Regions:
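Intrinsically disordered, low-complexity boundary segments flanking structured domains
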Residues: 34-42, 98-104, 130-135, 178
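Conserved short secondary-structure elements within globular domains
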Residues: 92, 99-133, 185-192
Length: 211
């Protein structure tokens, strides 16, 4: 997910769906202050919420997931992930420890679905580099990346991680790739998809303003 974009540029049976949101507890706030948030970020930690939702993993098993988003989208994010769960759409990893650590808890494959990370937007692979000088929607908690390995940021024949390369051809449907039903679920809450961009495509990326 967001971790991957810091890399060098390279050529179930379903029951009741429950979800909840809550402010960040003090230990998590402290952890973020030493990593993914700093003074000068466009939102405060008090603006953020943990949204807890069930998801279906790549083995078809129900898991309990968490994602940090801005409080003004917590309800709609909860709604969209309930829809993904009902669709049985597979998500590789979606727990706070997967995204924010500690380091020993971060999955080796880094194929983590997540939202908040106070950082710049990442330039197109056509341009290269890791920072654009402009805040990403992730810095506001207004964007979500879904299964980043299976849904690459792609442009000019380039990706940011070689593990993404097998998923560039979207005509070859593979597990974890964003489907039309997933796009419709996000559109139902007013979010746009990076797969609709002209030129460079960001297949993992959904956001409130479509950017």
């Amino acid at each position: 997910m967001l971790r991957l974009l810091a890399l060098p540029l390279l050529l179930v049976g379903l029951h009741q769906v429950e979800s909840s949101s809550r402010p960040l507890p003090a230990p998590l706030r402290s952890n973020l202050e030493h990593g993914q948030w700093h003074a000068g970020c466009p939102v405060s930690l008090s603006d953020l919420r943990i949204v807890s939702v069930p998801y279906v993993d790549f083995d078809g098993r129900k898991q309990d997931g968490q994602i940090i988003v801005h409080r003004d989208v917590a309800g709609s994010v909860s709604t969209v992930f309930r829809k993904l769960y009902k669709l049985k759409f597979p998500i590789r990893h979606m727990r706070l420890s997967d995204m924010y650590g500690p380091p020993r808890a971060v999955p080796e494959d880094e194929d983590v679905t997540g939202s908040f990370w106070c950082r710049d937007s990442v330039p197109s692979p056509c341009v290269g580099g890791t920072a654009s000088g402009n805040w990403s929607n992730h810095a506001y908690g207004h964007a979500i990346d879904i299964n980043p390995i299976e849904n690459p940021y792609f442009g000019c024949g380039k990706v940011y991680d070689p593990r993404m390369a097998p998923y560039v051809d979207r005509s070859k449907r593979k597990k974890g790739m964003v489907t039309p039903a997933v796009v419709r679920a996000f559109r139902s809450i007013g979010w746009g998809w990076g797969g609709d961009w002209s030129g460079t495509k960001d297949y993992m990326h959904f956001s409130t303003n479509g950017h």
